[in-house]
Amino acid sequence: MEAAQKICVGEVDRAFAFIGAGGHHAGRSFFGGYCCFNDVAIAIAHLRKAHGIRRFAILDTDAHHGDGTRDILQDDPDVLHVCICGMNYVSADGTKVDVPAPWGGRDPDESYLKTAESVFASRVHAFRPDLIIWYFGFDGHQGDYGDMGLSLRAFVGLADFMVGAAREACGGKLLTVLGGGSRTDLATLIIPKVIARLGNG
């Protein structure tokens, strides 16, 4: 919440919330996957109440569907929520979108990045949010529990893409929230590189 607030009052354009537990599986009346409170939904509610900010766009690139976030925000037309997961869904108003994650192929990183760009870029540009939130899980890396065959290149590429998307859609305002991932060796490899790219973009 503090990271989001610093963006909204103009102290910073981008912030990384190094959360110790997940949030996107916590819904209105359920929780799972070590997610007890939905950090993103709580931050949105706070920013609306404290700062009058209305429109938010979320890209969830955790390997698993953000079912809790969707449960809370499903009927909110001022939140664009896009998940790259194993599902395929578009709400009637186009603000809630699930796309199947690409699997296999010769270059999983490139396929994943192209999917993220194709599904999010045009939507967020048209939606014009006040703030973009990237729910960043690294559990899709090779060998983690959500293995999509991805490497460091995919996550660094996503960071570059999100900085550019935020710059075009909402004046660069981007909050990155750490999501799933279980291996400390991968966390040590990936997270510092992503933070560096977010800071240098």
Give short role names for the model-derived ranges.
Residues 1-201:
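A general "terminal functional-core" signal
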